[in-house]
Amino acid sequence: MSQDVNELSKQPTPDKAEDNAFFPSPYSLSQYTAPKTDFDGVEHKGAYKDGKWKVLMIAAEERYVLLENGKMFSTGNHPVEMLLPLHHLMEAGFDVDVATLSGYPVKLELWAMPTEDEAVISTYNKLKEKLKQPKKLADVIKNELGPDSDYLSVFIPGGHAAVVGISESEDVQQTLDWALDNDRFIVTLCHGPAALLSAGLNREKSTLEGYSVCVFPDSLDEGANIEIGYLPGRLKWLVADLLTKQGLKVVNDDMTGRTLKDRKLLTGDSPLASNELGKLAVNEMLNAIQNK
């Protein structure tokens, strides 16, 4: 007989691999994860056949987020937020390259993997080698960016690990600058928009000032995520708060699966937006190719 969900512990689960580190509580995982996503099919299977244009994914290489109370949250990129949008893009015909800041392996929140979702699992299996041995972002900038680059979009998935390092990276800043200067897409969701903070590094104002975005609600990270034991403490800073201070317009204060297009910036509010953001990215990229 299955355990009643209300009997599940709201205490974060210790991660024995690190001192004072914790995974989300059993109760929080019962609320936030599921064996399947809302994937309802690919709209443009094989639509892109030329083989030139690719996606550059900037993924997380650090697992632990240090919190205000000294505890660490054991996190990574959220597998649905990473793999479901990529499923749509890859099925449409776009190849994907994976990069991390230092070239170290990508970290995933495997506890959020929808183990019965064929779209997500098949994409994970196709990308597993690249996730284990990603490119170093600085090398990508040096050798593969420029006006003639084959990358049509930069994709930054979420998961709380996106708040570690990526928001303070000059390499991420250079990559976003390149995308803006060369009319390429920037696609991100949930906590991934933390990367957009790099656009304001050492500048009087962000190059993304005035853009509108969807992002994971600060109110959940300050409230419910702590109350149900998803987080073992308060984050040192909040993504939507800092984006707003840089002059971006956060359009949501809840988690509904909302997506948004502002020029070439495509954003989603949470894992719930993964499916629709993937569709949006494919549609926008195909339209851009037709108009080139």
UniProtKB/Swiss-Prot annotation:
Broad class of the protein's primary localization: cytoplasm
Region span, Disordered: 1-23
Catalytic activity: N(omega)-(1-hydroxy-2-oxopropyl)-L-arginyl-[protein] + H2O = lactate + L-arginyl-[protein] + H(+); N(6)-(1-hydroxy-2-oxopropyl)-L-lysyl-[protein] + H2O = lactate + L-lysyl-[protein] + H(+); S-(1-hydroxy-2-oxopropyl)-L-cysteinyl-[protein] + H2O = lactate + L-cysteinyl-[protein] + H(+); N(omega)-(1-hydroxy-2-oxoethyl)-L-arginyl-[protein] + H2O = L-arginyl-[protein] + glycolate + H(+)
Keyword Heme found: no
EC number(s) from the headed UniProt entry: 3.1.2.-, 3.5.1.-, 3.5.1.124
Composition bias, Polar residues: 1-12
Catalytic residues of the enzyme: C190 (nucleophile)
InterPro entries: Class_I_gatase-like, DJ-1/PfpI, HchA, Prot/Nucl_acid_deglycase
Pfam families: DJ-1_PfpI
Keyword NAD found: no
Keywords: Cytoplasm, DNA damage, DNA repair, Hydrolase, Stress response
GO molecular function: glyoxalase III activity; protein deglycase activity; thiolester hydrolase activity
GO cellular component, one term: cytoplasm
Intracellular or extracellular location(s): Cytoplasm
GO BP annotations listed: DNA repair; methylglyoxal catabolic process to D-lactate via S-lactoyl-glutathione; protein repair
Name of the top EC class for this enzyme: hydrolase
Family affiliation: Belongs to the peptidase C56 family. HchA subfamily.
PANTHER family membership: PROTEIN/NUCLEIC ACID DEGLYCASE DJ-1-RELATED, PROTEIN_NUCLEIC ACID DEGLYCASE 1
Task of the protein: Protein and nucleotide deglycase that catalyzes the deglycation of the Maillard adducts formed between amino groups of proteins or nucleotides and reactive carbonyl groups of glyoxals. Thus, functions as a protein deglycase that repairs methylglyoxal- and glyoxal-glycated proteins, and releases repaired proteins and lactate or glycolate, respectively. Deglycates cysteine, arginine and lysine residues in proteins, and thus reactivates these proteins by reversing glycation by glyoxals.
Protein name: Protein/nucleic acid deglycase HchA
